[in-house]
């Protein structure tokens, strides 16, 4: 078929490459540090996460906790975010456990390293810092996801007045490189950063309706 235009990898060839880790944020983002109610990973890394014993709970002065704030540094979001990964033949899901490690809840045999997943400072405007998640597959290959902002997808919040402000949060870590077991052979991926051209602003409009009686 001489009239058919070939793809970038050749005629009748398809290149299936890439992959990503995507996140469904539950409550506050796990990796965002806030003055109150940091995410789970941020609280663990900052040493604010404490597992109380039964004796601790019995001694907790609830009536003073709000007024005098005896325990201000123990506030954090307990609900872990849900991470889904999909690359090549591999797919699965994991969360961050109470020790700050990744725990697979679907898809077995994967080792997930969060040591280079950065804790982000709270911001509603600034791009996130470098953040990397590493996954070792059952066949021994090491996959790197994320890196600088070109390998990250993140959302800038639209914070209308009178609502609780949301921070900038990473939504996806894109596959950035692959290494074999020997780490002598590998491949790297590069991405071009771009910002969304169209921006939509959320606003609130309140109307009060009723009847008025005149006597």
Q: Where in the sequence are the language-model features?
A:
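Long, intrinsically disordered, low-complexity, charged/polar and glycine-rich segments
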Residues: 1-174, 180
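Solenoidal tandem-repeat scaffolds enriched in leucines and small polar residues
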Residues: 188-215
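Generic marker of "main functional regions" within proteins
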Residues: 25-27, 155, 185-188, 197-201
């Amino acid at each position: 078929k001489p009239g058919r235009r070939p793809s970038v990898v050749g005629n009748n060839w398809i290149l299936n490459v890439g992959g990503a880790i995507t996140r469904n944020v539950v409550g506050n983002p796990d990796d965002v540090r806030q003055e109150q109610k940091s995410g789970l990973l941020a609280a663990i890394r900052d040493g604010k996460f404490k597992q109380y014993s039964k004796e601790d709970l019995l001694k907790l002065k609830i009536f003073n906790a709000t007024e005098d704030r005896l325990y201000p540094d123990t506030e954090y979001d307990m609900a872990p975010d849900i991470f889904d990964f999909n690359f090549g033949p591999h797919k699965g899901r994991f969360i961050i456990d109470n020790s700050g490690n990744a725990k697979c809840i679907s898809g077995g045999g994967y080792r997930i390293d969060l040591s280079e997943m950065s804790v982000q400072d709270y911001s509603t405007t600034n791009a996130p810092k470098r953040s990397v998640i590493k996954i070792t597959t059952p066949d021994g290959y090491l996959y790197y996801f994320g890196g600088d902002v070109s390998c990250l997808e993140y959302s800038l919040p639209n914070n209308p007045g009178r609502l609780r402000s949301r921070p900038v949060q990473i939504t996806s870590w894109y596959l950035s490189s692959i290494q074999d077991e020997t780490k002598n052979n590998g491949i790297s991926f590069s991405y071009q950063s771009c910002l969304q051209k169209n921006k939509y602003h959320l606003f609130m409009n309140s109307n009060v309706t009723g009847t008025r009686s005149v006597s």
